[in-house]
Structure formats: structure tokens, C-alpha cells
Amino acid sequence: MGSSKWGVLFGLLILHVIGYSIFLKGFFPSKVVVPGFNEFHTGQSPFMEHNEAKFDKLILMVVDAMRSDFLYSDHSHMKFVHQLINENCALPFTSYSNPPTVTLPRLKGITTGGTPSFLDAILNIADDKDNSQSLLNQDSWLHQFQNNSKVFNFFGDDTWLKLFPPEKFFNQYEGTNSFFVNDFTDVDNNVTRHLNDDLFNSKWDALILHYLGLDHIGHKGGPNSIFMRGKQEEMDGIIEKLYKETIDSNTLLVVMGDHGMNEIGNHGGSSMGETNPGLLFASPKFKMLKKNLKSPLAYNNDYKYYNYINQIDLVPTLATLLNFPIPKNNLGIVIKDILGLWKPEAQKSILMENSEQFMNIYEAKHANDTDIINEWKKSQDSGSIDVHYDFLSKIQGLLTSAATEYKYVDIYIGLSILVAMAIVAFGLFNWYFLVQATINPKYNWYFIGISIVYSIHFHASSLIEEEYQIWWFFSIICLFALYFNNHLKSLKYFWLILVGLRIIRSWSITGQKFTTPYTFSAYLLQNVDLLWVLNIATYFLTAILIYSQGSLIHCVTLREYESLRENVKDFGSLVTFIVTFVTCSISFSFKLCQYFNDGKRVPDWLLAFLNWTCESYGITIDPKEKNQLHELNIHLSKILFYCIGVLIIVRIVLGKIRKLHYGLLTDLSNVLTLFLLHQSRPEIVPIFLIFSLVKFSAAKLLANNEIVLRKNIDQLMIIITLFSLCMQNLSFFSMGNTNSLATVDLSNSYNGFKSYDVFLVGVLTYCSNFAGPIFWSLASLQLIFENNVVCFDTKKSSKDLVNLKFLKYQILYVKSLAGFLFYSMAGLSLVASCFNLRFHLFIWSVFSPKLLFFASWTLLTNILIDTISSLSILALC
């Protein structure tokens, strides 16, 4: 097996991961904060009039992913909110939410007033037991309000409980898990059921409610989901209840989204939809401001309605309205619109308090900046409100840009390790292919050339955003090089691959800067009959491949037969046929039920099958009831996972007993393809038809030139490794993924689960988003080791490379070495780019997400799937 070579390779891979991790540790440090808790700089509050605060109580209602148009546009169904605005009882805003637009960093922002670090986006997925993000010892408006002997009650997203230990902050509380996106109703009902008791209970001063259902609907069906109207009406009804029950009290109602969502319902990036949630202050007291605003407004694509503010401006505004010191690390500015509640002389005092708090932070970091200090003194002497706001805006910009400090020691150590690994990988690769192997050097330079060109693209933000263009170019170049440089026969297969690549390229929206409605997936969503015909065809083909392409049927027949025709007459073959098609039908049934449960129209000709599936489990479909098949979907997924597990175990065990060495790679690949179908969205499923066509055509091209390629296996390794790299990346982007966190698909992350499990849900999330790369990783093993089996040519299967017991590990080693070179060069270039452009405008919105995606590529795809899993599968053959 060449254990020493493998030991060295795994050691290098581990060092590569260590170097990359150390770099990330230095590049994504925790945000620098000033310790301690703030006090009024004069010892007395400037926010009170006649010794009274403007408000005594607060109700903060956070509606997760409440984009501004959901509140204010003429597409909105929140009629009571519109009524409040028209009656001058509410102040509406669109609030800019700093990326990354995920819940944890946004909650930090709206409670401390600080800007989030990108590290918070990673920690957002931590499980409920993680308390590393606690804000117990950091100043926040919760701490300040509580310090005034105020009592908090909290119900909703348990992310709040990670930030604020409930035993320290909340009198009553109940958390709901924010990651179980299949739940649209219970997750909100568990919040609302507390309202009847709490609204009439005078033992609270602040009530925090965080609703998750709207966000979950977005993840599952997008902003135009059939469930969106009902959820908006539900939220509007809750706002009406909260407002009317507290209208006679001195209570401030704040309704807001922590972030928005993009046009596919996800978030995490920096698009207009994601960064522009709504923010509403409601109270009869606002009538005195006489804003005379109208609502709803016409829908607009930039999602900017009414006045545009920073979301963190909420923090000093709450401090002003509720009379407590502005939190020490706040970077928000008191919202100008609310100053009309005070007399002109008091307005200046409020802004001076905000300025004092800003300067405390600024002087702690820039003690010797006399220009800013002089400008500050001038603003204090000015009687103009605008001068104060200009100064605050300037300091806010300076503090925001310097909120995070890089740990340069970690960055340099990580970079040094990555440089060393790239040099070693380059040396090992060239030593093997230029010294030991007999390969034509041009193939070696083809691979290195593509690796270099790919690595260079990381130094331009637009190329990272549109990376699919690079892989489309590489795929075509690779195909032509494969065909013409090897003088391969069968032109028809060349054209089949070329057409297949073009279809794959156009399957989904693949970039961040340019989008188009003219994609295959968009067309299929508009033509559901064709969509489900193709889905049936995909599942049918998968069942046929599982049944007949490999050697599964030979493992279960009662005796050995010479031909497939004789095999199918065997009783064991019949059992295999039934099990295979039943397993595929379970996954198809799940897809159909999931599609219906998400509120989408099922074709009329499939309704009978849907009803039969539901009735088999004692469910009668009620058109008025939403999300009624949730439990059935969990059950179907569990059954499928068990069936797939049984198929794999039976194939391995019976194969060992009957000493069937050929076809195992193909059998495992086909069964796992069924799992990948299960983890893909319905409009993505048919792309696997094209994948299978391209794989079969590539196998035929290689088979027709078998004599030449078998004479030089190293040449075969380079060709297939390069081809699989191109197909892995092209398929990743063509299935709707990008280098933005906003396109991470969670719709299939909870298949088979009733609750959130960070590890298992993480596995399913990876498989859902990297289904294409996983498919082509398995396909590359088939093309190398079982090419004739892929071509259904069992008579030649004895010539496949999988039968070379000792050489097969050397072959996989060479493939893994090539992958290591590619990822080490690319990883080094990426981190060098991020370090060089660390002050670039798009460092957090473009380059930093790519760092996280590349970590998934190198650790999970290259090391875990391409190397470790491939080695494990090969050991079974």
C-alpha cells in the first residue's frame, strides 16, 4: 500500500490544515472592546424631562428576516402597521444591517451598538451548549436597563440565551431553536402563547420576543412563498395585540428585523435585500411629532423605505428614550427623528452625551489625535444640531473601520506554513511526474498551469464573485485537451459531453453580480409538469443503475449466471429489483410531499400518488391546513436513510462472502447518488441526469482509447483528476451555489430530524450544498478504477484498474498528490490575497466568505471525500 508515502501525504495535509487554521485565527480575531460599563459623563441623565423618562417600559419584537418591504411596501400584508404609520403613531425606518447578515452578529449589534466581527458568522451555528459568545461582561442596553432595577422577560430565539445568561438577565424565559427551518408554526406559537399572561403581568419592564417562522419560510420557499402572506398577517395581528393592550401605559413598542433575506430566501451576504430590514417605533406619544407619513409605499428593488439609518442606531436611541447610559462600546447615533420629543436645549445635551461616549472609545485607541479632539471641542460649542450629527457620523466611520485588529503573529505563522506546504507539494508533484513517471511533460504543465491561473483569480473581488466563469472556461479547455491530445475516438461522446456541460452551465443562477431568469431550474419551477417528469426519469435511471450497472445483482442471486438476462430470472434478483425501486420510490415520495408541504403546486396527474402516499400513513390531506406533512417527511427520510444503509452493508458483506471484487465502487457510487438526490431541491434533481450522461460519455471516451491510457496510467491520473476538479467546481456553482454565505441552502438540512443537532445537521447541510462535488469525486474513482463497469461492459471488467491489488493504492496516491498541489497553491494564494487586501472595501463581504468556503473545499471535499473516503472505499474493493 506504500504506507510511508501515505503517512507523509497525510502529515502534509494536516500541516496544511493547521497553517490555514492559524491564519484564520489571526485574520478573524474577536472584536476589540473597551472593558467596563458606561455611566453618564456628568453623573446626571440628559435624557429626562421633568425628572421623567419618555418611556418606562419596552416591548422589543424581533421578527427574524423581516425585510423592509414586508413591513412597508404595497406588497406587504401588515395592515395594522400601515394604520399606525398613517395615524402618526409609529416612526418607520429602513435600518442598514452590517454583514454578515446572520442572527448572532446582528443581535450583538442591536444590544451593544458595536459592529460584528466576521468570526460571529461562524459561531452563529454553534449548538445550545456553547456559551463562548456570552455578553455577560460586556456593556449592552440590557445591562444598563437592568441596572436601573428593571425586570426582563424573554421568549423566542435561543441565540439570546447564548448571549445573555438567562439566570442573570431574565425573570421568565423560554428559548426556541433557530436552526430547525422546517418548523413554520410551533416555533412562533411557543412565543405567542406567553403573551396573554405576560401582557397583563406588571412584573416586567422589558419584554423581548423573537419570532423565527418568517425566516424559516424564507429558507424553505423564498420571500414569495405561499406561506409568507399568512405569516405576515400573523405577525401583524401580534403587533396589534401588543400595541392595543399597552396603549394606555408608558410603553415603547419596537418592531424590527435582525436582517433581511435575498430573492431565494437566504441571508448572510451583503445584498440589498439582506442588509435592509425594517425598524418601527410605535407609541401614541409619536403623534406630537406630526410626521404625516403615508403607508404602504410602492415596492422598490433597493428595499429603502422612509428614513435610512444604521441598525446599531437603535442602541443609543433606546438609551435616550428609556433613560439609561449609552453602552460603552456603542457605535450608533441617536436617531434624529425622535429628538422632537425634547425641547431644543435638551436635544444638544443628548447629542453631547452621544459624542462623549464616542470620544471615550476614540481616545482609548487614538489618544494623540489632536485634530479630532479639536474638532470635538468645536462641535461642543456649536448650537447647531447638524454640526453635532456631522461630527458623530465622522467618528462613527473612523471607529467602525478600526473596530477589529488583526493578529499579525498568527497570520505570519499561518502564511509561513502554507508557503512551506505549497513548496513541498510542488516539489513532490514535479519529482514524481518529471523524474519517476514516463508521462509526457505537457500534461504535468497543463495541471500546474490551471492551478496557477485559478490561484491568481483570488486577487480580484469580481472574479471571486463570478468564479463559475473560470470553471466553465477550464472545463471546456480540459474537454478539448482530453479529446485532441489523446486522439480519442467516438466524436459523438465528445459532443455529448460538450452539450452536457452547456446544460450544466445554464442550470441555475451561478454568480453574484449577474443574474438571469433564463435558467433551466427557473424554467422547471414555472413548468411543474415537466419538472416532475424529469424527476421521475432521474429516479428511474438511478434505480436502473443501482440494479444493473454494478454487481449488486450478482451478490444476491442464488447462484452465478453468465449473463444479465439469466440473472433477472433469479429470485434474489427479483428481491433486489423490489428493494431498489422501493427505496427510490421512498425518496421520490419524500420529494413530492416536501414540495406539496412547501406550498407549491403538485401536477394534477401526481395528486393520486400523493394522496395514496399520505393515506398509507393515515393522513388525509386538508387543503386549508399548512405544513401538515411535516411529520410524514421526517418519517420518510428516516426510512430512506435506513434503506440506503442496509443496501450498502448488504453489498459489502455479500460481496466479501461471494468474493465479488468488481463493481463495488460503482454500486456505492450509485447508492450514494440516491442519497444526493434526496438532499437536493426538486428543481436541482434532474441535473443528475446530465451528470450521469457526462460520466457515461467520459467513460466511453476513455474506454475507446484504453490501450493507450493503460500503457501510461500516470497520464490517465492527470486527465481524470483535472476533469473531476473541473466538474466538481462547475457543478457546485451550477446547482445554485456561490461564494456568498447567503446561498447556503438549508432546505434539506433537517431531513429526518425533529430537532437541531449541530453535527448531523452540519453533515446534511454539507451534502446538500456539495452534492455535485461529492458526485464527481465518486465518479472520478469509477472512471479510474471501474471504467468498463461504468460502460456496462462486464466482460472487460477484469481489465479495470481496481483489480490491481497493490498498484491501486499507488494510483490513488498520485491522484491525491495532484489534489494536494492544487489546494495548497490555491490556499496560499487566497490567504496572501486576503492579507494583501485586508483593508479592501469588500474584504468582509467577498474575500472573507471565500476563506470559509475554501476551508470547506480543502478540509471536507479534498481531504475527507477525495482522499480519506476514497482510500476507505478502495480498501473494501
Curated annotation (Swiss-Prot):
Q: Which InterPro entries match?
A: Alkaline_phosphatase_core_sf, Phosphodiest/P_Trfase, PIG-G_N, PIGG/GPI7, PIGG/GPI7_C
Gene3D superfamilies given in the database record: Alkaline Phosphatase, subunit A (3.40.720.10)
Stretches that traverse the bilayer = 409-429, 443-463, 464-484, 528-548, 570-590, 634-654, 683-703, 716-736, 758-778, 817-837, 854-876
Q: How is it placed in the membrane, per its record? A: Multi-pass membrane protein
- One GO process term, biological-process aspect: GPI anchor biosynthetic process
**Which top EC class applies here?**
transferase
Its domain of life? Eukaryota
Record-level Gene Ontology MF annotations: CP2 mannose-ethanolamine phosphotransferase activity
Q: Where in the cell is it found?
A: Endoplasmic reticulum membrane
Record EC number: 2.-.-.-
Q: Which Pfam families match?
A: Phosphodiest, PIGO_PIGG
Record keywords, A-Z: Endoplasmic reticulum, Glycoprotein, GPI-anchor biosynthesis, Membrane, Transferase, Transmembrane, Transmembrane helix
Pathway connected to this protein: Glycolipid biosynthesis; glycosylphosphatidylinositol-anchor biosynthesis
What GO cellular component entries does it have? Answer: endoplasmic reticulum membrane; plasma membrane
- Glycosylated positions are 190, 368, 611
Role: Ethanolamine phosphate transferase involved in glycosylphosphatidylinositol-anchor biosynthesis. Transfers ethanolamine phosphate to the GPI second mannose.
Q: So what family is this one in? A: Belongs to the PIGG/PIGN/PIGO family. PIGG subfamily.
Q: What is this protein called?
A: GPI ethanolamine phosphate transferase 2
Organism for this UniProt entry: Debaryomyces hansenii (strain ATCC 36239 / CBS 767 / BCRC 21394 / JCM 1990 / NBRC 0083 / IGC 2968)
Q: Which gene encodes it?
A: LAS21
